[in-house]
Each structure stands twice: as structure tokens, then as C-alpha cells.
Amino acid sequence: MQTVAVIDYGMGNLHSVAKALEHVGAGRVLITSDAKVIREADRVVFPGVGAIRDCMAEIRRLGFDSLVREVSQDRPFLGICVGMQALLDRSEESGGVDCIGLFPGQVKFFGKNLHEEGEHLKVPHMGWNQVTQAVDHPLWHDIPDLARFYFVHSFYIDAANQRQVVGRGHYGLDFAAALADGSRFAVQFHPEKSHTHGLQLLQNFAAWDGRW
């Protein structure tokens, strides 16, 4: 039976992610901060919620920045929400925070004056929204284009390499909702909270061989 390591650095909705993975039959799901267990896992999930400065402080304290770079190279790897944002170069949150740098680009604030067709939009962006599939990817298997996923975020990803953008969202402005590069896949939304389509994405991740 394959193992899926859910990285625990004290800043994630770990149990809901783990339960969703177990629900789709992903294998033996381990919530862990043990680097040895993470290195030995067949697949790795990197969730995250909260302030990016606090997240990156814990990631660096535990040495997980280098560990994430290592394990995401040679096996299926999934970043979720702030776990996705931590994979970018830098976030402007909290006055500016350097991140892990696996995907080129910046994490930017939606702003206080966000509008759509004359209507003021509340920040954070919270609730269901469509994701446009920019390119075909194994993790989109059996998920229709413009499927709705659940988002909770005040900061969005401005990707520097548009070829890595495999899913796009829109909330007053366009943003990267999903990024992919090799065996790495990352989403701004919460698949574990996104009902049928979110569970399908996790099932696809559990079956994915990491090639793209």
C-alpha cells in the first residue's frame, strides 16, 4: 500500500486533508513532521493556513524548505492554499516574506478597493468560485472545465511563468488557481472542502505517476 505524507509544520488544516485523502482511498495517510517519514513517502501533501510569515518561520525552523525542494522533485507533490503560496518566490504579506522559490512569481494582496462591474468585493475571497483549466493535466481528469472549488484567501498568486499556470481563477482580477511543474502541483483552493470535484482531484493525485 502506498503512503501519503501530509507535512505537519503546525500551520495547516491537516486532519480534514488527511480524512479526504483516506476517503478517496489514497493509501496509508500519515500526518507527520518526521523528515525520514516524509522522504520515504510515495506522495507528499503540503497544506497550510494562516499568515505566511509564521508559516515560513516554522518551515525554516524545521528545515522543511530544503526538504520540500528535495521531495517534490521525484514524486507526486501537492501544495494547498498557503502551502501553495509558500512555493512561490516571495509574498508581499507582512511587509514582505521570502518563500521557498519553486515556482517563480509573487504573492500579492487583493487590495481594499477590489471591484467587479461596479460592485465592491469583500476581501478575503471566501466561498465557491470557478476554475478555468488553462491546460490539460492528469489532476483535472474527470473534472469539468469551470468546475467550482472552495477558496479562502486574501492574497493571490501572480505567476511569472504562465506555462506553469494550469488553472485560473477570477475575483476582481485574474489569478493563478493551480500551478504545475513536473511532479509538483499546487492549488489555491481547498480540495478537501470542495465536495465532488475536490475529492476527484485528490483521487487523481493518489493515482498520478508524477509525470506531466
UniProtKB/Swiss-Prot annotation:
Protein name: Imidazole glycerol phosphate synthase subunit HisH
Originating organism: Pseudomonas syringae pv. tomato (strain ATCC BAA-871 / DC3000)
Primary location recorded for the protein, binned into one broad class: cytoplasm
GO terms of molecular function: glutaminase activity; imidazoleglycerol-phosphate synthase activity; lyase activity
Domain Glutamine amidotransferase type-1 intervals: 3-212
GO BP annotation list: L-histidine biosynthetic process
Keyword Coiled coil: no
InterPro entries: Class_I_gatase-like, GATASE, Imidazole-glycPsynth_HisH
UniProt-annotated location(s): Cytoplasm
GO annotations of cellular component type: cytoplasm
Residues the record marks as active site: 81, 190, 192
Pathway(s) served: Amino-acid biosynthesis; L-histidine biosynthesis; L-histidine from 5-phospho-alpha-D-ribose 1-diphosphate: step 5/9
Subunit structure: Heterodimer of HisH and HisF.
E.C. code: 4.3.2.10, 3.5.1.2
A Pfam match: GATase
Keywords: Amino-acid biosynthesis, Cytoplasm, Glutamine amidotransferase, Histidine biosynthesis, Hydrolase, Lyase
Lineage top rank: taxon: Bacteria
Role noted for this protein: IGPS catalyzes the conversion of PRFAR and glutamine to IGP, AICAR and glutamate. The HisH subunit catalyzes the hydrolysis of glutamine to glutamate and ammonia as part of the synthesis of IGP and AICAR. The resulting ammonia molecule is channeled to the active site of HisF.
Keyword Nucleotide-binding among record annotations: no
Reaction catalysis annotation: 5-[(5-phospho-1-deoxy-D-ribulos-1-ylimino)methylamino]-1-(5-phospho-beta-D-ribosyl)imidazole-4-carboxamide + L-glutamine = D-erythro-1-(imidazol-4-yl)glycerol 3-phosphate + 5-amino-1-(5-phospho-beta-D-ribosyl)imidazole-4-carboxamide + L-glutamate + H(+); L-glutamine + H2O = L-glutamate + NH4(+)
